[in-house]
Amino acid sequence: MSKADKALLIVDMINNFEFDMGETLAKKTEKIVPHILSLKEHARQNEWPIIYINDHYGLWQADIKNIQQECTNERSKDIITKIAPVDADYFLIKPKHSAFYETALHTLLTELQVRHIIITGIAGNICVLFTANDAYMREYSITIPKDCIASNSDEDNEFALTMMENVLFAEITTEEQIIEK
């Protein structure tokens, strides 16, 4: 059981990047990995649950090893090697864009007594935004470290951050600011 009411969500970071603009997103994702890893270490030190929630890539299995194997290629290998979950982390699969849609995430967060989520991952303008929207609908407090999300374009990422701040009342911050609190 968590000692805090916060949890770190890591969305879709186990990814094959084999889609339109996948190469662009992979390059942007490489830049956020160190920030997410730093935040992950901070979460571990503070005993916050670390929850990976990921696309299933047609496998429909919550077996992280199979998903990692399915996603590993020249474009994704370095990212997956660095960011992969460890045994102490939670791992859930999702069928669509939101981490809440048709998943056990809300039940898990309730069981862990989490009321504040820090959302990281990709793509900021799709899966992170939809997850933040559904978190808002469930009355979670939301923090988005802007150096821990990436989208296909900087404009799309900025638009998503603006929406999350102005419509979903998410706190937009940085990994460093979260650690300094």
From Swiss-Prot:
The lineage of its organism: Bacteria, Bacillati, Bacillota, Bacilli, Bacillales. InterPro entries: Isochorismatase-like_dom (IPR000868), Isochorismatase-like_hydrls (IPR050272), Isochorismatase-like_sf (IPR036380). This is Uncharacterized isochorismatase family protein YaaI. Belongs to the isochorismatase family. It comes from the Bacteria. Keywords: Hydrolase. Its EC number is 3.-.-.-. GO terms for molecular function: hydrolase activity. The gene is yaaI. It comes from Bacillus subtilis (strain 168). PANTHER family: ISOCHORISMATASE-LIKE DOMAIN-CONTAINING PROTEIN, PEROXYUREIDOACRYLATE/UREIDOACRYLATE AMIDOHYDROLASE-RELATED.
